[in-house]
Amino acid sequence: MSEMTPREIVHELDAHIIGQKKAKRSVAVALRNRWRRMQLDADFRQEVTPKNILMIGPTGVGKTEIARRLAKLANAPFIKVEATKFTEVGYVGKEVEQIIRDLTDIAIKLTREQQMGKCRQRAEEHAEERILDALLPKPKNDWDNTDSDTSSNTRQIFRKKLREGQLDDKEIDIDVAQPQVGIEIMSPPGMEEMTNQLQSLFKNMGQAPAKRRKMKIKEAFKLLIEEEAAKLVNQEDLKEQAIELVEQHGIVFLDEIDKICKRGETSGPDVSREGVQRDLLPLVEGCTVTTKHGMVKTDHILFIASGAFQMAKPSDLIPELQGRLPIRVELDALSADDFKRILTEPHASLTEQYIALMATEGVTIEFAESGIESIAKAAWQVNERTENIGARRLHTVMEKLMEDISYEASDKSGSSFVIDADYVSAHLDNLVQDEDLSRFIL
């Protein structure tokens, strides 16, 4: 789990997301509170529940990007899901409990990687012995072993060469475990546990024996380390730790929650909107979900919901769900100045990406200050006159601007281009000023 302070978390988010200080502060405090809670006594800890967050803001201002970056910082089970992918229990479609099952699978993978990392040294030793056995096979008959000292010395010589990398390109025949092939079984509602058991049964039945393969020692060493590390991991301990990790540190990001708001009066069951909200209630409030790894309690899982709320309002959510999302954060619409900062300030910004891509063809690109201002202004104007899609408009504008250079780059190795205000004007002015063209091209 991340032990970063709120200030450090905001600083990390600043490297990728422009503006939106309120949203950054809220998620930073929520993430830090996960760590603070774990410092409390076990009895008192159970009484401290997470304060779930609802992020409200137009499309393209950074809601989803905050989730993506938070996932990397959290160092805890994290899943991002679209609320529109689910339907009410009993109808065709995914049930909301699948969110927790997927989150548990992520925790299993995360815990397995951590445990395999702890026993990596032992795994390397075992892998090394297997490679030496392949290089220096033991004699088939005991009477062939005439000089054990000589054999031992030879093994030590090869061990030294192996560790120094002198044998990396040598090919050997080695027995490698075959990857297991899973079988997907569609289950009727309420029978997920039976489906999981059937999947496990078929998976075990389909285990293929180890297959002898010819490969270079460097490649074989990596495969054997993974195989040996997997053998050293205790599967029961792994499941217990993963479930504990989900229950205490799990984070669920529910995107597009505004799309499941009820709009106006409708006849018949609203299975993909209000029905989904009703099914989400017990998850957010706290319930027990059955997974193939065991029972998972959701009482202390942090839920962060987000939506544009252009066609609906937060008050259109059912009251019970509103009450379970107590912290509200509004994200601001982006200005032309924000667009300019987005083009230059973040790590691996759009301009840096195009410079690096064209450099692979031997073409030098330079973005002048005037050019960056013109690009930002053009994107902002198109957003104002047509649909406002936020920073995503920059991708469209930049791709149109760089279209000719990208097409001809392979034939112009050694060339240099300066993207200034004149260049931007020549390539974008007609599109920006013509509203019909803007709607279809930008």
From Swiss-Prot:
Region annotated Disordered, chain positions: 133-156
Binding residues for ATP: I18, G60, V61, G62, K63, T64, E65, D255, E320, R392
GO MF term list: ATP binding; ATP hydrolysis activity; peptidase activity; proteasome-activating activity
Gene Ontology, cellular component aspect: HslUV protease complex
A GO BP entry: protein unfolding
Signal peptide start-end: none
Keyword Transmembrane helix recorded: no
SMART domains in alphabetical order: AAA (SM00382), ClpB_D2-small (SM01086)
Coiled-coil residues: none
Pfam families attached to this UniProt entry: AAA, AAA_2
Subcellular location: Cytoplasm
InterPro entries on file: AAA+_ATPase, ATP-dep_Clp_protease_ClpX, ATPase_AAA_core, Clp_ATPase_C, HslU, P-loop_NTPase
Keywords, sorted A to Z: ATP-binding, Chaperone, Cytoplasm, Nucleotide-binding, Stress response
Family: Belongs to the ClpX chaperone family. HslU subfamily.
Subunit structure of this chain's protein: A double ring-shaped homohexamer of HslV is capped on each side by a ring-shaped HslU homohexamer. The assembly of the HslU/HslV complex is dependent on binding of ATP.
NCBIfam families on file: hslU, PRK05201.1
Role summary: ATPase subunit of a proteasome-like degradation complex; this subunit has chaperone activity. The binding of ATP and its subsequent hydrolysis by HslU are essential for unfolding of protein substrates subsequently hydrolyzed by HslV. HslU recognizes the N-terminal part of its protein substrates and unfolds these before they are guided to HslV for hydrolysis.
PANTHER family xref list: ATP-DEPENDENT CLP PROTEASE ATP-BINDING SUBUNIT CLPX-LIKE, MITOCHONDRIAL-RELATED, ATP-DEPENDENT PROTEASE ATPASE SUBUNIT HSLU
Name of the molecule in the record: ATP-dependent protease ATPase subunit HslU
Phylogenetic placement of the source organism: Bacteria, Pseudomonadati, Pseudomonadota, Gammaproteobacteria, Alteromonadales
